[in-house]
Amino acid sequence: MLHYAIIFFVIAIIAAVLGFSGIAGAATNIAWILFVVFLILAVISMFRRGKV
């Protein structure tokens, strides 16, 4: 999942340089969603490790 987040992050950076429209705008939204999901999963895993 981190691999996909990095790929879409790079696409989002390119989209920012070229302008947010069409596929570029969609890639930016996907990158944002993957970032939030990965961040939430990382926080959950940090808290769960402490209780094991």
UniProtKB/Swiss-Prot annotation:
Gene Ontology CC terms: plasma membrane
Subcellular location: Cell membrane
Pfam families assigned to the protein according to its UniProt record, in alphabetical order: DUF1328
Keywords, alphabetical: Cell membrane, Membrane, Transmembrane, Transmembrane helix
Chain ranges passing through the membrane: 5-25, 27-47
InterPro entries documented for this protein: DUF1328
Chief location: membrane
Record membrane topology: Multi-pass membrane protein
Family, per entry: Belongs to the UPF0391 family.
Listed name of the protein: UPF0391 membrane protein XCC0220
Species: Xanthomonas campestris pv. campestris (strain ATCC 33913 / DSM 3586 / NCPPB 528 / LMG 568 / P 25)
Classification of source organism: Bacteria, Pseudomonadati, Pseudomonadota, Gammaproteobacteria, Lysobacterales
